[in-house]
Amino acid sequence: MNPYQVVKDFEQAVARYTGAPYCVAVNSCTAALMLAVAWHLQKRMPDGIRYKATWVFDTETRHTAGIIGQHAPLHEVNIPKRTYLSVPMSIIHAGGRPTFRDEEWLGMYQLEPLPVWDSARWFTTDLYGIAGMRQPSGPKGAMVCTSHHWSKTLGIQQGGCILHDDPEADAWLRRARFDGRTEGVAPKDDHITQVGWHCYMSPEVAAEGLVRLHFLPKHNAPLPNDEYPDLSQLEILR
């Protein structure tokens, strides 16, 4: 028996529940956002340019600076200034530069101008369709990132998902979450073509998610926002 089949079963169940064509499970919504942003940013780079951004804090100027190769620009990704701390950090780790806006949001918000949505505080049926209707460019290409942390609606140990509609992105995301590896192929037999991260969902977490999803109501209200600080005032993120 393949122990990772339960992860695929969980992904299929979440896709049905939310109305998403594809679902990629990872170990947190933070990781989901990072991978979704990374996918879109690398698609926006000129052919042949692949860069890594290194962020350093200059104690003299009191500013954070990005050091990148090949003079590649840092793409700005705009988010509400009051959200969870890991969101701008995910943007940085993905190679972008976070900027902030004033927005009173509930349930989900867009990481502008990317078609990426942070829905850590809302998990309900037809979630993917809801995000698509809110997206100014139309529903195509939306990536909705969910959280299944024990404090959230589904309430398993940890975990998150990327809901999307792109078969090319699906293959990339599955390798990206698993150290660049191909699912089901031993490292010695694999042909590694991309640098990945180590953020896949473990089978035991997926199994718990399947059980809880079976009993989850169809319609769930957004969770209230925490008392988030103003992230635009953090020097490390400026």
Describe these PLM feature segments.
Residues 1-31, 39, 223-238:
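Conserved N-terminal alpha-helix of the aminotransferase class I/II PLP-enzyme fold
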Residues 25, 79-80, 162:
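Conserved SAM-binding loop
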Residues 31, 85-86, 168:
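Short alpha-helical
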Residues 32-40, 160, 209:
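Buried hydrophobic packing segments
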Residues 38, 42-126:
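PLP-dependent aminotransferase-like
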Residues 123-129, 140-238:
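Active-site region of PLP-dependent enzymes
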Residues 136-138:
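Long, low-complexity intrinsically disordered regions
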